[in-house]
């Protein structure tokens, strides 16, 4: 039997975001500014997956995501798993859950929203509706799909 080979190189210490839906890895890199840490980032796109068919994976050397940051990832990849790595071994495995509320991450797409011209922090309530993630602005109370808010 042939030894199993990793598609993306292992890291000694850091974070692995696994089981990202294929094609969403780049969005997560951009939205969470994962390239701004100054650490090595390894990305695999459209890798084979037994459960998903294909998946993306992100490995960030020397950076450990806290629970709050990990749960924000659920907006883009609810089935992703965040693994904390130490000495090349998984020391913590977190399955993501959608947060009830998210603050200071996105800007409201409504140009008339009070959150635009005022010194207030953005704040959205997160809901699942018909299988889609929806975000309701705390200030203008308009509801948007995840992609509309992410691109604003």
Swiss-Prot record:
Cellular compartments per GO CC: aspartate carbamoyltransferase complex
InterPro entries for the chain: Asp_carbamoyltransf_reg_N, Asp_carbamoylTrfase_reg, Asp_carbamoyltrfase_reg_C, Asp_carbatrfase_reg_C_sf, Asp_carbatrfase_reg_N_sf
- GO-annotated molecular function: metal ion binding
Q: How is the cofactor bound?
A: Binds 1 zinc ion per subunit.
Q: Where are the transmembrane segments?
A: none
Protein biosynthesis found in the keyword field: no
Q: Which residues bind Zn(2+)?
A: 108, 113, 137, 140
Q: Name one GO biological process term.
A: pyrimidine nucleotide biosynthetic process
Cofactor(s) recorded for this entry are: Zn(2+)
Instruction: Give the keywords, sorted.
Output: Metal-binding, Pyrimidine biosynthesis, Zinc
User: In UniProt terms, what function does this protein have?
Assistant: Involved in allosteric regulation of aspartate carbamoyltransferase.
Q: Which family does it belong to?
A: Belongs to the PyrI family.
Q: How does it assemble?
A: Contains catalytic and regulatory chains.
- Name of this protein: Aspartate carbamoyltransferase regulatory chain
Which organism encodes this protein? Neisseria gonorrhoeae (strain ATCC 700825 / FA 1090)
């Amino acid at each position: 039997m042939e030894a199993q080979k990793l598609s993306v190189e292992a890291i000694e210490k850091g974070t692995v975001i696994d089981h990202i839906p294929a094609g969403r890895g780049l969005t997560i890199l951009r939205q969470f500014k994962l390239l701004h840490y100054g650490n090595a980032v390894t990305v695999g796109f459209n890798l084979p997956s037994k459960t998903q068919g294909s998946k993306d994976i992100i490995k960030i050397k020397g950076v450990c995501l806290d629970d709050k940051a990990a749960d924000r990832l659920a907006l883009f990849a609810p089935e992703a798993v965040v693994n904390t790595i130490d000495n090349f071994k998984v020391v913590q495995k977190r399955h993501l859950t959608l947060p009830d509320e998210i603050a200071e991450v996105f800007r409201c797409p409504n140009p008339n929203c009070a959150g635009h011209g005022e010194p207030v922090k953005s704040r959205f309530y997160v809901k699942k509706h018909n299988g889609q993630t929806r975000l309701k602005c705390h200030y203008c109370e308009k509801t948007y799909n995840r992609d509309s808010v992410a691109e604003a």
